[in-house]
Each structure stands twice: as C-alpha cells, then as structure tokens.
Swiss-Prot record:
It comes from Desulforudis audaxviator (strain MP104C). This is Methylthioribose-1-phosphate isomerase. GO terms for molecular function: S-methyl-5-thioribose-1-phosphate isomerase activity. Its EC number is 5.3.1.23. It catalyses: 5-(methylsulfanyl)-alpha-D-ribose 1-phosphate = 5-(methylsulfanyl)-D-ribulose 1-phosphate. Catalyzes the interconversion of methylthioribose-1-phosphate (MTR-1-P) into methylthioribulose-1-phosphate (MTRu-1-P). Substrate binds at R46, G47, A48, R88, Q194, N245, K246. The record marks C155 as: Transition state stabilizer. Keywords: Amino-acid biosynthesis, Isomerase, Methionine biosynthesis. The gene is mtnA. The keyword tRNA-binding does not apply. It comes from the Bacteria. GO terms for biological process: L-methionine salvage from methylthioadenosine.
Amino acid sequence: MPVEALYWKDGRLYVLDQTRLPEETVYVTCSSYRDAAEAIKTMRVRGAPAIGAVGAFGLVLGALETGGDRESFLARLREIAGVLRDTRPTAVNLDWALERMLARAVETLGEPGALRAALLAEAQAIVREDIEANRRMGLFGRELIPDPARILTHCNAGALATAGYGTALGVIRAAREAGKQVKVFAGETRPFLQGARLTAWELMREGIEVVLVADNMAGYLMAREGLDLVIVGADRVAANGDVANKIGTYSLAVLARAHGIPFYVAVPLSTVDLRTAIGRDIPIEERDPAELTHFRGRRVAPQGVAVWNPAFDVTPNELITALITDAGVLKPPFGEALRRAVGSGRRE
C-alpha cells in the first residue's frame, strides 16, 4: 500500500520524515506552525503538493495558537503564512495553498473559533482534492503508457511527494492497475538521492519492477535500453508551459529529445502558475553547499571548494511532449491550453 506523507490527528500534524528513509519509517509531530515550517525547510517533507498540504495545516496550527479579535487574528494569520511561504521558494503549491487558506479565513463570518474550524476544513479539502487530482492524472496518463513499457523517472513524484497516490508515479501506478507491464528506471537524483531513497522504496513496496541507475547513466540508458518514455513531476509550471523540477530534469529532457523518446510531465493544476510568464522568471532555490561537499556527515570534497547547489532547473516547453494534468493531457502549444484548463478546473 502507498505510504502517507502526512496526516492530521487530534490537533496535531504528523509528517513522515523522508530524510530517514529508507532505513526508518518515522513520523515527526508538528505541534506548531514553526514545526511545520521546519519540516518543509529541512526536507523532512518534500514534493510540491505535499509541501502545500503541510503549509495549509501549518496555518491551522498557527490559528490554534492565535487569539484576539477577528482583525488581529487575521493579521497574525498573514504573518504566519509569510513564515511558511519563505521556507522554500520554488514550489508554487505552497503559495497557492496558503493564499487559498487565507481567502477562506477572510470569507468566513464570525470570530476566531469559527475561522479555526473553517481553516481545518479547508486544509482537509486541499488534501482530499490533491488525491482526487492525482488519481485523475493517473487515468489520463495511463493511456500514454504502452504495454509493456520501459520508463525512466527522476526524483520522487509519488505518494511521498503528494497528499497521496502521486503524480508521475501515480501515472505508473494507474498503468499497472490497468494490467500493463511496466519496468521503471529510477535515477538516483543527486545530491539528495530522492530517486534512490524514495522512488525505489515506494515502487518496491508495491511490487513494481524498478532498476536504480546513476544520474550520469541516463544517456547511455536511452541509447542501450530503448526506453518508451520519460515521466517526471514538477514544482512549478509557468504560463507558457516551461517547467521547474528537480535539478537534472532539463538534462533528461535534452537527452530524451536527442533519442526520440517522449518526455512527459505529470502535474496537478495547483502547480500551474499563470502569474509567472516564462520559466526563467521562476525563483530557483539554492541549498546548503554541504549537500554536495558532505555525505552522511562525512566530507567528500576538498575544504574550501566553491559550490553551486541549485535545487531545481527549468525545462523549456519545446522539450516537453505533453503535460499530464487532472484536467486532461495537454499538448503544445501549452499557453492557451493551460489558461483554459486552469480557468475551468481549479479553484482559485
């Protein structure tokens, strides 16, 4: 069974600590919005939809800590949302979820007690809707999967990265549930090893055939093994269809184009940012140099070496075969298709 990345119980948020996988399955307790912010910042939880859900519940935790009259309560909520929003800048779901939560608070009549109840209901709706969206993506996307299929994926876009079921891995799950034979090649995804630690673990739990490969093997893998497709998730999609995803995605898209292999991005509409016109306008998070210079606490690079460690890159829309969304499969040109899909299929 797919694992839960997060759940709410008795006024607390429980987050699966993904930094400890695959060795340990441990949930950390978030009792305050600061705990939720720390879980996001330290990548105990990661993946754009999952980050959005944790941010939403983080605002609920903040509301439970906040008193005063209605106006002071709303002002404090905005401050807490700012703290949560600043944890990771690239994944747009976090900002989207927080804006949705704040809008729900403003439109709810009554004093703080009523607002707290409304916020909890909204956070639970965000989780429920994400799972439903992922399952719809799976149904749309599985039609693109041949039988049998040899698939390369990158990072982790499964149940661990979402409220449940997954985006890219959700499509693979749906194909498997439809009786198709799939073999997945999981890129290790340096430097945080989400592919090695998380994707391989998820797929093995469900009995889906998976082969772990080093990131720098991708070109040779495509030339040697005759892949049927590459499928990844996304942390933000610009209005023109450019996609920000885990560092290394752009390289895979270039290689896929060179080898004539379809390159698909599975993404819920909550990850589409129509306010960002093109990919180069997407803010790219840069992380701690120690993620490259150290491995499990041990230095593996010379002391004092310069490090550049962007967590994401941007894949131009012209390298993308299709966007698999919860509103259907979108083909290029993506601009108008995204505007129509968001306008008809997403709650703002």
